[in-house]
Regions:
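Hot-dog-fold acyl-thioester-processing enzymes
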Residues: 1-78
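Generic structural detector for well-ordered beta-strands
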Residues: 16-20, 86, 133-135
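Sparse recognition of residues in long alpha-helices and their boundaries
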Residues: 28, 45, 81, 110-111, ...
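Short, intrinsically disordered/low-complexity patches at protein termini
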Residues: 39-41, 51, 64, 79-80, ...
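HotDog/MaoC-like acyl-thioester-processing domains
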Residues: 1-14, 91-139
């Protein structure tokens, strides 16, 4: 876990990590969210409507933005305050995702960092883009 403090941050600072999406994560997220839409739970249905298989829950994929902020950029001293997300392409179980974030703006008055983030999968295909606002609670 990174421990960037406010005074350590600068525009252009980047962090990244990789994660693979597992069936176990899908099952757990489905139980927690209560979302039983067959697009996410029934691969045959998903194929019939034009996908390669069951589509990973968008908010499961988006949860990796929380990991980015809480563990990597800024890490320990961060509190996610807002996020705007665009889903660009579907994610499937077994995909390996690269989550990248870069600080694009710092507000001294609010001690808030704005992070431009994206998630891509193998081959570099972007699956999600986000703008994240993060409070930093340590000087």
């Amino acid at each position: 876990m990174n421990e960037y403090r406010w005074n350590d941050l600068r525009t252009g600072l980047q962090e990244e990590f990789k994660v693979s999406v597992t069936q176990e994560a899908m099952d757990t997220f489905g139980k927690l969210s209560g979302d039983s839409n067959p697009l996410h739970t029934d691969p045959a249905f998903a194929v019939r409507v034009g996908f390669e298989g069951a589509v990973v829950f968008g908010l499961l994929t988006s949860s990796f933005y929380s990991r980015l902020v809480g563990l990597y950029l800024p890490g320990k001293h961060a509190l996610l305050q807002g996020i705007d997300i665009d889903f660009v392409s579907p994610v499937y179980v077994g995909d390996t995702l690269l989550v990248v974030g870069e600080i694009i703006f710092l507000s001294e008055a609010y001690r808030q960092a704005e992070i431009r983030a994206r998630i891509s999968k193998q081959g570099g295909l972007v699956v999600s883009k986000a703008t994240i606002r993060v409070g930093v609670h340590a000087a």
